[in-house]
Amino acid sequence: MARICFLNPFGTDSYDELIDSTLRPALHGSTEIEIRHLSHAPANIDYYAPKHLVETEIMTAAIEAERDGFDAFVIGCCYDPALTQCRELVSIPVIGPLEASVSLSRLFGHSFAVVTDHRKAVPELRDRIRLYGLESNCRAVDAIDWYVTDMVLDPIAVAKDTYIKVQDVMRTTGAETVIIGCTIVSACYELAALRGDTEMASLSVVNPNVMAVKLAEMFADLNATGQYRISRTAYYQQHASHDVAEAAEILELLTEHPATRSMTQV
C-alpha cells in the first residue's frame, strides 16, 4: 500500500475537496492519499512574487510529509514549484504534475500542446517544457484566461471553456494530445467528465493530477523494492554530503513552524 501526500500549494483549503473528489476514482484500491494545503502562504501563485514565497513553504511541506511516513509527495501545481529543491531535501519520491505529464505525453500522441489557466502562466510553462527537454514535441502553449480564485466558483464553466480551447488548439496546431497545464483547471475538466460529459471524456486530454499521482504510486513501489535509485552525485546532491552543519541550519530554518494542514484539519 502506498501513502501519498498531495499538496495543494496554496494558503487556502478552497481547492482541497475538488482535487480529492476528482483524484480518488483513479487510485489503486490500496493507495492512501491525503490532500494538504499550506497554512502560511499566499492564497494563490498566479504571480511570480507569491510563487517565490510559496516555494519555501513547499520545501517545509515535503519534509513534513517524509517525517509523517508518506511514501511519495506530489506538488499540486503545474509550475512544479520547488520541485528540484524538494528532491534535494527528502529521500521519498517527489513528483511535479507538469514534468510527469510532458514526460508521459508520447504515450498519448506523437505531439502535444498545453492549455493552461491564464496568459501569465504561458511563458513559465514554455520555459519548464524547454527545461524538461521536450520543447520540440510541444506544438503550443495556450490559455483559457481564468484565474484560480474564480475557478471554484463555477468549475463546469471552466471545463466548458477548456473543452472549446482544447479543440481549437488541436485543430490549429495539429497536436494529437493536450495536457491541461493547471491542476485546478484539470480538476474542473475531470469533474465534468465524471459527471457524465462524454464529449469531454472522449478527447485525448492528459490530466496532470492523475499523471502525477499514478507516477507517485509507481515510484513509491520502486522505492519499496529498492529500485528508486536517484543520483546524488550532482543535480540532486544533498547539502549534508558537503557540510553537515550547514545542512542542519537550513533544515532548522525550514522547520521552524508547520507548513501544512490536511483536509481533516480544516
Question: Which residues does each PLM region occupy?
Answer:
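Glycine/small-residue-rich loop that forms an oxyanion/phosphate-binding "nest" at active or ligand-binding sites
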Residues: 59-104, 108
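N-terminal glycine-rich anion-binding loop in soluble enzyme alpha/beta folds
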Residues: 1-56, 117-154, 252-264
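Short, flexible loop segments at boundaries between secondary-structure elements
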Residues: 146, 201-225
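Active-site rim beta-loop-alpha module in soluble metabolic enzymes
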Residues: 129-183, 190-193
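Short, acidic/turn-prone active-site loops that include or flank metal/cofactor-
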Residues: 97-102, 118-120, 209-212
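Periplasmic-binding protein-like
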Residues: 7, 67-77, 175-183
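Glycine-rich, highly charged phosphate/nucleotide-binding loops
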Residues: 47-64, 158-165
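Short acidic, glycine/proline-enriched helix-loop-strand junctions
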Residues: 83-95, 189-210
